[in-house]
Amino acid sequence: MRALGIILAGGNSNKLGDLSAKRAVAAMPITGSYRAIDFALSNMTNSHIQKVAVFTQYNTRSLNEHLNSSKWWDFGRKQGGLFIFTPTITAANSYWYKGTADALYQNIKFLKESHEPYVVIASGDGIYKLDYNKVLEEHISNGADITVVCKDMAPGEDDINRFGVIKMNEDGRIIDFEEKPLVAGTNTVSIGVYVIRRRQLIELLETCANEGRNDFVRDILVRYKGCLLYTSDAADEL
C-alpha cells in the first residue's frame, strides 16, 4: 500500500445550529442510512487505501457507533484496518485537540509506526466522490511536497469565503493560499483533501508543536512557503 488515510472528523459547525448540537457533522445523516463520513470512507476503500485513521472529538458517540461497523468499508485486512482516535487526557496532556495539526501531532505515534510512504488527508464532512489514486499520481509526477485538491467555484458564489482560496501559476503550483478570506481573490478553492509524504508530515508536525502552532492549514499550508505546494484538478470530476 502506497498511502495511508487520515480523516479529520472532530470539528463542530456552528452554522448547522441545532442539527449539530448533539451530533458530529461527520455523522449527519445523508439520504437515509448513510452518514457524511461515508463518502470519505468509500473514497478511501475505492482507492485501495486499506489503513485509515479517523480523528474524532466533538459529539463522538453517534459517529463512533457508526464507525464500529467498519466491515462496510472492507478495512479489516491483516495489514490494514480502521483506527479511531479521540483526545486522550493524561498527566502530560490535559486538553482536547487544539486544532487539526495538534490532532495529528497527538497521534504522531500512529504515523511513525506506519510504513506507507504517503498520507492522504481528508475532511470527514465532504460530500463527493474522488479517486485519491489520481491525486497521488499527480503528487508524485509533480515532485510536490504537498498536493491540495481544488475546485473552481462558479463566479459570485456567496459561500466561497468558507473555503481556503488558492492562487496558482500556469504549472499548477500554489503561489498564494488564503484561508476563508473576507474577499476572495480567485474562485479556486481547496476541498480539504491533501497528499503529503509521511516522513515530511511528521517533521512539519514536530516543528509546529515546538512552535506552539496547531492548525494544519494556517500553520503548515499557509505558513511554510518553502514547501512545494501543487494543486490537483481531480476534483473537477465532482
Predicted region positions:
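A conserved hydrophobic position in a structured secondary element of the catalytic/binding core
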Residues: 58, 122, 196-197, 216
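Conserved core of the sugar-phosphate nucleotidyltransferase
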Residues: 129-199, 203-211
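Catalytic donor-sugar/metal-binding loop of nucleotide-sugar-dependent glycosyltransferases
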Residues: 222-229
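Cytochrome P450 catalytic domain signature, combining two hallmark sequence patches
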Residues: 72, 209-214
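Conserved N-terminal catalytic core of the sugar/cofactor nucleotidyltransferase
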Residues: 1-8, 12-15, 19-21, 25, ...
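Structural motif
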Residues: 5, 82-83, 118-120, 145-148, ...
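Structural signal for conserved beta-strand scaffold positions within catalytic alpha/beta enzyme cores
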Residues: 29, 84-86, 148, 176-179, ...
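Conserved small/polar residues in nucleotide/adenosyl-binding loops
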Residues: 230-238
